[in-house]
């Protein structure tokens, strides 16, 4: 039986050395956990992680995390702490350079993230901050027929005319506070209209509380003149800018 339904492959050597003290009702753990030469690929994630080296030191009610991994030829690191003394808390820092992201057939990209994550699982609070640089990417025009994605068990279907915020509040969603800056480098290309269109720009992405959609501020534009084929004609595209000042899916 698969470890998880959407896990394509998983490998590595996991070891633990430590001791247990305290009482049956209040055990205390101390020890070291190591993952050597780990790897994982999941159909739900656009990354295949390889060469995962992870070390965690568990000291009673707290654990530290130090790890490194590869995605393509890019290198990433993951550090942080997990504390479960009172209200459990997870604090992580993700850094990387030229990590390979691939969501076939729509996008292949290299990303350089610097992200901090703070999670309070019992309170359902999540804070996400940082920046993601995209020095290189190839974005393809989606096909006319979009592949079907199965609905997960926690999805709530919102019918037309229903109050989305009220439904979200009744479902007790996570309180998310996200602030991310995304910058496009000079090798980001959109492939469509029988042309390769170079893009450039920056977006500030944010989400607050029970908001139903991520918001964006910034602009993405064509960085140089190109020739495209659209509406049955060959056209010169001199200038095009998509400006964002609201819901991410609704640029102007």
Q: Where is each model-derived feature located?
A:
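Short acidic, glycine/proline-rich loop/turn micro-motifs
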Residues: 2-4
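Short flexible loop/turn segments that cap and initiate beta-strands
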Residues: 27-33, 128
